């Protein structure tokens, strides 16, 4: 995930630092490499058997287990397919660095969703995945249908987030915990 985060933040900065506009295939290749490296790391974890619970802020909100790893690989493959499928499309567009950066940042959220063991972390990860996709939906700023789609997607996402928060609050009220394992028992 650190690879995706560093590259995702670096792509627009590299674009700004370069004097001439970089080609979309350059930024796409960097994003592709970061995604391949992330899949390689997850597979390396499986091969070493170093799958152990991860803790953030001394709370078990992420579990680095085989189930999460399998879905993390699936999500990263989806991000790779999106990146590869965007090469030709982005040749005609400006700011391809931002486009590929948003794909990587969304992939981070997808991987966090896969490893999440807490409802609050699941919600935060879902939002981390969703917010870049709202921007991607409205990427074609001058196209009215793109703007309309982004607005509708954002409003639908905001309503969905409110419903999810309401459901999490009910689950917490009934069980006294937001841990998924404790909530389902």
At which residue positions do the language-model features occur?
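Alpha-helical transmembrane segments of multi-pass membrane proteins predominantly involved
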Residues: 1-185
């Amino acid at each position: 995930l650190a690879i995706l985060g560093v590259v995702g933040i670096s792509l627009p900065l590299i674009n700004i630092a370069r004097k001439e506009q970089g080609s979309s295939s350059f930024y796409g290749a960097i994003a592709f490499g970061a995604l391949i490296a992330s899949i390689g790391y997850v597979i390396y974890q499986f091969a070493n058997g170093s799958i152990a619970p991860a803790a953030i802020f001394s709370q078990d909100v992420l579990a680095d287990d085989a189930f999460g790893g399998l879905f993390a690989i699936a999500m990263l493959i989806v991000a790779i397919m999106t990146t590869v499928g965007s090469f030709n499309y982005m040749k005609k567009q400006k700011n391809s660095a931002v486009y590929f950066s948003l794909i990587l940042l969304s992939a981070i959220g997808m991987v966090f969703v896969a490893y999440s063991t807490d409802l609050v972390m699941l919600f935060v990860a879902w939002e981390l995945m969703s917010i870049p996709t709202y921007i991607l939906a409205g990427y074609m700023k001058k196209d009215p249908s793109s703007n309309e789609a982004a607005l509708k997607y954002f409003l639908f996402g905001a309503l969905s987030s409110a419903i999810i928060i309401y459901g999490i609050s009910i689950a917490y009220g009934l069980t006294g915990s937001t841990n998924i394992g404790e909530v389902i028992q």
